């Protein structure tokens, strides 16, 4: 599966409900972070530390990233 194939329903099934949500798919404002344009961001805190970040633009997933406890960030392969 690629990030572009990930839907909101599949993300909830795979990762659960996010711990934090910033923006929403209907928000007309777009932001850019880590080279990704988005208007909704889901943040999951990981048990081993760090977090998983899922970026959405409208209903399209724009990328999934994993932040390590040391703050380094890598795109997650789905």
Regions of interest found by a model, annotated:
Residues 1-78:
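Residues within mature, well-folded domains
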